[in-house]
Amino acid sequence: GQPCKPQLLDPIPELTLDHDSHRYSYKGQLLARSVSEVIGHDLTPEQRAGMERYKHGPDGWAARGTAIHKVLEHHLKGEPCVMDDKWSPWVDALLDESLFGRFRLLACEFLLVDERRSMGGSFDFLIELEELGVPKGKGLIVLGDLKTVSHKTGVGRRKPATAQLGAYLSMLNRLRPKVQVSQCVTVVSGPERCKVIREDPEDCHAAWEEAWSRYNLDLPEF
């Protein structure tokens, strides 16, 4: 099912992202950190080295993630998208997922800011599920993050982006309080397999505050 004409959330004024450096700026000032930095704070040196090892090149996770995020963004907006055929096993399974059947798009690749914590972030999608007999604006609102994995077996092993979704949720609640998120989802996209992990927004929010506390303990005192 194609989405109807989207009623998108207005972007946050004066908030920008430099994609090359992955740094956010708000009202002309660079923000000190991103959600990804805070979440990545818990990684061991071995985990960081492993991520770096498989990041680069035409088949690295950075290229894969960018390509598949782009396809999903175009699908959510109801736009055609040209992509390399090598990503078809990922894309076919992803777009077959029932979550992306009948929905109304509220936002995708949406930039957020937490001014108090000098932090930026951006979520992948916010949709309202369309259900028979449910009036527009009364459907389940789903906040989602897309993760890609290299192998089919990795789909089952991938953990949900619980704290990350909690960060987006807390910023969204502050910036757009009328939006009531019913469910947070991590969509795990692998070749020929896709999995949606659904979580309660309150659990995500609690996981985020825990992650922030751990990160904050290591911040230098001024």
Question: Where are the regions that the model predicts?
Answer:
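Metal-dependent nuclease catalytic cores that hydrolyze phosphodiester bonds in DNA/RNA
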Residues: 1-120
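Mg2+/Mn2+-dependent nuclease catalytic core
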Residues: 110-222
